[in-house]
Design a protein with these regions (language model features):
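Small/aliphatic-rich secondary-structure junction motif
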Residues: 2-58, 63, 68, 72, ...
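Glycine-rich, Arg-bearing micro-motifs that act as flexible, cationic patches
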Residues: 103-125, 140, 257-283, 293-298
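Intrinsically disordered, low-complexity Ser/Thr-rich linker and spacer segments
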Residues: 138-154
């Protein structure tokens, strides 16, 4: 694919919308939103969802503090709705080429996931990519020397696990890398294990490609060579899981953005890396681009 065709696929965003609530963790998505807005030539907006008009003035004041502006600033939006995710997406639909950028502060498992319930609900209903700042972006580990400003490293890491679903977002990841001027690295985290004793027998990994992982990423590199020039691939062998493996990789090889593909299963957001994908948001020290998979891959 030539450079002109790649530019046609590049994401275009005029607004970056940050959902706010009453916690400091929601406000902590603002630096990431500003970095995205600077790259896209966009403006940062906020949205808060309340159950009553009586709260509107107080909430607008909160949005003003987050944006360091006046409460009458038109970039501050307040939706009245008992359904937070519906209010956020309704606001996003009214804005010009909007990108939702949110934070999640969940540090423990709730309902089988490491993603907070409100963030999970917003992601579940998204039909376009959403950027999520996880707890290590919101509240960085002081001992992590790889931490940089949001999008401060020109490298995008796209996570795959050997399934068609996980690879469904690679075209979007490549377009984002091109638009942001980042190098694209495709990473798979695999449990180290010996090959099957019998030729043709299935692999039995707990996580990672159910085949030779090095051969798998070599094949991906060949497939995507024209569409993503300069792409490189990495296999991270980790016996514990996807989250710890990716976290160690990012500490040794910093990135500005991580991408993972998501899908819905029975109306519960099920990321294609299973629990490992929720671990990625939870464990990543950089924002995560969550890409909805096409329906045919879910």
């Amino acid at each position: 694919m030539n450079s002109c065709a790649r530019r046609d696929l590049d994401p275009i965003h005029r607004t970056v919308l940050v959902p706010l609530d009453a916690t400091r963790f929601a406000d902590a998505a603002i630096p990431t939103a500003r970095a995205l807005a600077a790259r896209f030539g966009a403006t940062v907006h906020t949205v808060s969802v309340v159950v009553s008009d009586f709260e509107r003035d107080r909430i607008r004041a909160q949005g003003a503090r987050a944006l360091d502006t006046d409460p009458t600033d038109p970039r501050i939006h307040v939706e009245v709705d008992s359904d937070v995710a519906a209010g956020v997406h309704r606001c996003a639909a009214r804005l010009d080429e909007s990108l939702i950028c949110l934070s999640t502060h969940a540090r423990g498992r709730v309902g089988g996931t490491l993603i907070g319930s409100t963030a999970r609900d917003i992601i579940e209903r998204a039909r376009r990519p959403v950027v999520v700042a996880g707890p290590l972006v919101v509240d960085p580990d002081p001992d992590d020397r790889s931490v940089a400003a949001p999008l401060g490293v020109d490298r995008l890491v796209a996570c795959v696990d050997g399934t068609t679903g996980s690879e469904a977002g690679l075209r979007v990841a490549a377009a984002w890398a091109h638009a942001l001027g980042m190098k694209l690295t495709v990473v798979t985290v695999a449990e180290p294990c010996p090959p099957p004793l019998r030729i043709g027998a299935p692999w039995r990994r707990h996580h990672g490609p159910q085949e030779d992982a090095d051969e798998y990423v070599r094949r991906l590199a060949e497939t995507w060579a024209l569409e993503a020039p300069g792409l490189d691939t990495v296999v991270v062998y980790d016996p514990i899981g996807v989250g710890p493996g990716l976290r160690d990789h990012l500490e040794e090889h910093p990135a500005g953005l991580v991408a993972v593909t998501s899908r819905l299963r029975d109306r519960v957001p099920h990321l294609v890396l299973g629990s490992g994908a929720a671990d990625i948001v939870h464990a990543s020290n950089v924002p995560v681009l969550v890409i909805p998979a096409p329906p045919e891959t879910t």
